[in-house]
Structures are given as C-alpha cells and as structure tokens.
Design a protein with these regions (language model features):
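Eukaryotic scaffold repeat domains enriched in small/polar residues
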Residues: 1-249
Length: 249
C-alpha cells in the first residue's frame, strides 16, 4: 500500500479494510494480517479517504477527489457516487462511521456530525459548541458520539438524542488527529506530529503514552487514524510508514 489513511474493521466477517488514498484503492486483510484482495472500482475511485460496510453488504466510501459518499455494490461491481446536501448546502464529508445500523459523517465545512438514513439523507445534526475549533475525528461507542477538537484539544460527547456532556480538556498533545475509546472509558489520542499514542482518563487526566516519531519498528511517522477492533486490539494507521500497526494489551 502507498499511503493508508483509514481503517475499517468488519467485525462480522473479521476482515480489515485499509483505505489507500494515493493508490485509489481499498485493501482487505484477514485477522492475521494476510492480504486478501484489492478493490479499485475499475479505476474509478478518486482519493478515497474513509469507508464502512452497510448491513446489506455494500460499502460506503468517502471520496475526497469528487466530494462524494459513494455506495459500492461488490456483487455487481457497481459504484454510485452521491454528493450529500443539507438544506440545499453541499456537505463536505470527512470521516465516516456506521454504528447500530446508523450512518454518521463528519462535515468538515460546518464542523457538524450528521446522521443519515438508509437513503443517505440527513436526518439529524449534532452541533458542536459555538467556540469549537476544528473537528479532526469522531467515534460512536455504545450509542454515544465522541468528537475530537484538534485546535482546542478537547473531546466532546453526545448521547443519541444529541444532548451534550461538558467538554473534556486534553493536555500533553501537540497535533491530535484521531481518537479511540476503550471499554473502560479511556481515551487513546493519536498525535500525528509526535508519532505517539497518548492515553487519558475519563476526565482528561494524563495516563501514559507510547511510541515515538520515526520509521523503525516501534515508531510512527505521521500516523492518521486509531481505532479498536472487535478483539479489543488497538489499530493504528501509520501513513508515513505505509502500514497498520496492531497492539494488544
């Protein structure tokens, strides 16, 4: 793979999908890291950035090259791009999550997280605080949305009805780009510039950090995303080193 930018874990099939933006392709791997196959939509993908699998088996792919949320029918090898709109305004999709049968996207222009229906139409909007900075990532864990503010270095959370909780301030990170939340409620923050994973408690208290910037076995070089798989392992998309690293406790 050239430059991996995102990882999707298919818990049901126990497969790992890596989004290669520069190579304009999706790569699938088994749980042991064995390469399975690649998908390019017959060369039509344009700068894919994120992806997820729907209940019907089709894939949703964020294509930044055409600003679309593209539905991919693997069986019929058909890709259908869709430019999302909310109240007549074009949505610039960044990150994508599917949880509990619901589709969520991050609109990088408005800074909102949007919930979509089966027809990929906006049905709910989660608005960040008025003084929010720049949202870099979000995850949906147990019906709760967790969003990472890169500029203010804060974590926002919302329940499924959109009710917010007080923001959680993070200290000791330089350039947070992604977050993951474990079953104990700890935050795993990926610092792109430092090449490190920094762990915080539920209230934002610093716990520890691991990995450093570099191109060796125990290094990260401009990493892009972090998430937990169905086995509780922490997966880190290490863009600069063209790999995905998997850690277990």
């Amino acid at each position: 793979m050239a430059l991996p930018v995102a990882l999707y874990v298919d818990n049901e099939k126990e497969r790992y999908y890596v989004v290669d933006s520069t190579g304009n392709k999706l790569l699938s791997f088994a749980g042991d890291g064995k390469f399975l196959q690649e998908f390019t939509a017959e060369g039509s993908l344009q700068k894919p950035y994120d992806m997820a699998r729907l209940a019907d088996g089709s894939l949703l792919v964020v294509e930044k090259g055409r600003n679309s949320l593209t539905r991919v029918d693997l069986k019929n090898k058909k890709a259908t791009p869709l430019v999302l709109k909310q109240q007549g305004r074009e949505v610039f999709v960044d990150r994508l999550e599917v949880a509990g049968g619901k589709v969520y996207v991050l609109d990088r222009l408005s800074g909102r997280i949007l919930q979509l229906d089966e027809a990929l139409q906006v049905v709910k909007s989660f608005t960040m605080p008025a003084d929010a900075g720049w949202l870099a990532d979000f995850k949906v864990v147990e019906k709760k949305i967790w969003a990472l503010d890169q500029k203010k270095k804060q974590v926002y959370s919302y329940d499924e009805n959109g009710r917010p909780s007080p923001p959680i301030q993070l200290t000791g990170v330089d350039f947070p780009v992604s977050l993951a939340v474990d079953q104990a409620g700890l935050f795993y923050i990926l610092d792109r510039h430092r090449g490190a994973v920094v762990v915080f408690g539920r209230n934002g208290e610093f716990k520890y950090q691991f990995l450093t910037k570099g191109q060796g076995r125990d290094n990260l070089y401009f990493p892009q995303e972090v998430r937990f798989d169905h086995l509780g392992r922490l997966c880190v998309v290490d863009e600069g080193n063209s790999r995905v690293m998997v850690f277990k406790r």
